[in-house]
């Protein structure tokens, strides 16, 4: 798929997607093939920073100590300082935090304490602070660039089933913006598959309520 093909697909989607009383998400659906998920090298897990946000604001949390507290407080949506970690040994409170938060930024020198407190809750939900997304940072780091980057970042994850469904845009974005995000995600996916395009069975683009439009790849 090149950028022109991506734009053509978006145009086709516009033709079939009916207007609703709400702004619909636009999802990329990829069916994979010839992958053995028992092999670690066949498990798909990476992050893509798209050219544009998907249109949905990401809720960003920070797990820090005094070194980053003021910086995190000025940038992130919720900040849990080290001295409050014990409060989140309450499973209900920890689960509520995990549910509302898309990404967690963590201070690197307290990762052991973060893992001990939050690992059992965030780990199964794939929300532990992840170095692959740049979410584990040194003390005194400026967080605004990372916060802005995470607003455009999605996780591509397939460990058990050979299908991906990723929210890459909203219908109120321009065709060019949607196409740029589509191309960026697909291009990165191809380069993370062991057999590249040969691991792709089919690709579709759809809005929340529309029928899927096939992408020729």
What is the predicted function of each stretch?
Residues 64, 168-170, 207-209, 217:
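Flexible glycine-/small-residue-rich
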Residues 72, 123, 205:
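Residue-level signature of catalytic and energy-coupling elements of molecular machines
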Residues 75-81:
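Active-site regions of enzymes building and remodeling cell-envelope glycoconjugates
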Residues 27, 58-61, 78, 102-105, ...:
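Structural motif
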Residues 82-184, 188:
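Long, charge-patterned amphipathic alpha-helical coiled-coil/hairpin "stalk" segments used as oligomerization
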Residues 16-70, 90-91:
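Translation machinery proteins
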Residues 8-16:
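Interdomain regulatory linker/hinge segments that flank or connect interaction modules
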């Amino acid at each position: 798929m090149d950028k022109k093909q991506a734009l053509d697909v978006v145009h086709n989607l516009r033709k079939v997607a009916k207007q609703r009383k709400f702004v619909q998400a636009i999802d990329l659906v990829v069916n994979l093939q010839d992958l053995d998920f028992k092999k670690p090298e066949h498990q798909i897990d990476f992050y893509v920073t798209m050219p544009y946000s998907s249109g949905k604001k990401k809720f960003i949390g920070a797990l820090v100590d005094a070194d980053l507290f003021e910086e995190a407080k000025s940038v992130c949506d919720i900040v849990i300082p080290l001295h409050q970690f014990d409060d989140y040994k309450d499973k209900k409170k920890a689960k509520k935090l995990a549910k509302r938060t898309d990404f967690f930024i963590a201070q690197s020198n307290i990762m052991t304490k973060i893992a001990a407190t939050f690992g059992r809750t965030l780990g199964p939900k794939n929300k532990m602070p992840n170095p692959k997304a740049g979410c584990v940072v040194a003390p005194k780091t400026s967080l605004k660039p990372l916060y802005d980057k995470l607003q455009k970042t999605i996780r591509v994850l397939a460990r058990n089933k050979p299908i991906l469904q990723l929210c890459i845009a909203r219908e109120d974005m321009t065709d060019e913006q949607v196409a740029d995000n589509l191309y960026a995600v697909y291009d990165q996916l191809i380069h993370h598959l062991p057999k590249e395009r040969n691991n792709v069975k089919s690709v579709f683009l759809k809005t929340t309520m529309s029928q899927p439009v096939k992408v020729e790849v």
